[in-house]
């Protein structure tokens, strides 16, 4: 259920702060969001896949923690990221 290398590279290129940036919160949140969206499609077909659902909840929690960190460090970057990803907050 993971993303392929081309998709990851495209996401990293779009959200990176500088060349070769893979560790910034924006990149990490964007990658987690893509994985979460991919898993949501999986659960429409496989409603009783509880093992993968646990992984999904772990990813959502990790994304929430990264977003809280970014909100505390730089509010404008946080708001820009939320708008770009189309998250509800």
From Swiss-Prot:
Gene: rpsO
MF term (GO), any: rRNA binding
Alphabetized UniProt keyword annotations: Ribonucleoprotein, Ribosomal protein, RNA-binding, rRNA-binding
Coiled coil (UniProt feature): none
Domain of life, source organism: Bacteria
PANTHER family with a match to the protein in the record: RIBOSOMAL PROTEIN S15, BACTERIAL AND ORGANELLAR (PTHR23321), SMALL RIBOSOMAL SUBUNIT PROTEIN US15M (PTHR23321:SF26)
Chain's role: One of the primary rRNA binding proteins, it binds directly to 16S rRNA where it helps nucleate assembly of the platform of the 30S subunit by binding and bridging several RNA helices of the 16S rRNA.
A cellular component annotation (GO) from this entry: cytosolic small ribosomal subunit
Protein name (Swiss-Prot/TrEMBL): Small ribosomal subunit protein uS15
CDD domains found in the cross-reference section: Ribosomal_S15p_S13e (cd00353)
